[in-house]
Curated annotation (Swiss-Prot):
Catalytic activity, EC: 2.5.1.6
Record carries keyword Transmembrane: no
Superkingdom, natural source: Eukaryota
Annotated positions binding L-methionine: 56, 99, 246, 277
One Gene Ontology CC term in the entry: cytosol
Binding site for K(+): 43
Residues annotated as binding Mg(2+): 9
Role of this protein: Catalyzes the formation of S-adenosylmethionine from methionine and ATP. The reaction comprises two steps that are both catalyzed by the same enzyme: formation of S-adenosylmethionine (AdoMet) and triphosphate, and subsequent hydrolysis of the triphosphate.
PANTHER family (UniProt xref): S-ADENOSYLMETHIONINE SYNTHETASE
Listed name of the protein: S-adenosylmethionine synthase 1
A GO MF term: methionine adenosyltransferase activity
Amino acid sequence: METFLFTSESVNEGHPDKLCDQISDAVLDACLEQDPESKVACETCTKTNLVMVFGEITTKAIVDYEKIVRDTCRNIGFVSDDVGLDADNCKVLVYIEQQSPDIAQGVHGHLTKRPEEIGAGDQGHMFGYATDETPELMPLSHVLATKLGARLTEVRKNGTCPWLRPDGKTQVTVEYCNDNGAMIPIKVHTVLISTQHDETVTNDEIARDLKEHVIKPVIPEKYLDEKTIFHLNPSGRFVIGGPHGDAGLTGRKIIIDTYGGWGAHGGGAFSGKDPTKVDRSGAYIVRQAAKSIVASGLARRCIVQVSYAIGVPEPLSVFVDTYGTGKIPDKEILKIVKENFDFRPGMMSINLDLKRGGNGRFLKTAAYGHFGRDDPDFTWEVVKPLKWEKPQD
């Protein structure tokens, strides 16, 4: 049996880039909660003792940007300079302007257009992907890397591993076999975890705790054997972390946010963007389309692409590829996708309820992936029953 290795990485919520994603989405939540028509393009950057929020926001909401920044940093665990950032004493800069009137008239006619007339907020192309190798219909390498990152945070916050600090990265290499286009995971080849830690803990304690409290609960035993390679804090020391260790920026972790290197990516980031930005809403609807195709049994693996022009409601193109796993030809599946999914931005907002913010809805998406999550707020993960004319035998 011929096999190959494929690797996906993740970072947890204390990574500086992910901190920025979460702040940008916390701002989006606050705007949408008070004004569902808010137009938000919110970027964040951070370095030692500094967080800056900047971008274009047009909203009726009254938003305390500085409070959102400090609350988000505090909730992640950035409560002192020792751990990489002090939420209560760091410098917070805010540079927010209104959305360009040129963009506003072209996209939503200054809020005069009906939902089906609303144009895409920008040009671009987005991809959705699904595979039957896990219950989430997501790639196993990505699922495991993401869950390891989430588990690192869990054992830090619940006190199981008190030596942990907020910043951390994970990476999982899986050995796969290609079954006529479908991906079959054979075993986990390599597990890599680099996590920030305090001054007192030894490397042996780190390795022992990570194996016992992080890896064991996350990776099913059937995927591990005596040949599995573990790299646990291979650099030997990771005390300085968070924004003190590295600068952070919104939109720098787009592969971690999506499919871990599987499928494809159009390049547009998600966090801090309202649903008229098709970078986000377009990627969400094509994930729902790909997932629904695989869940319905029409294919074992599927990628869907959609593309847009600024100000134009209808997509320019829709593409489907099932990697040879389709039960019917791809052109038939493409027809089914077009008949069952409305790719116009205004209609995607309605059908996926994307104007509803608050309650940390979009903040939740900004760490541990936007897809494959079992949470009612992730409306794009709901499998849509597909209506189509089955060919007569």
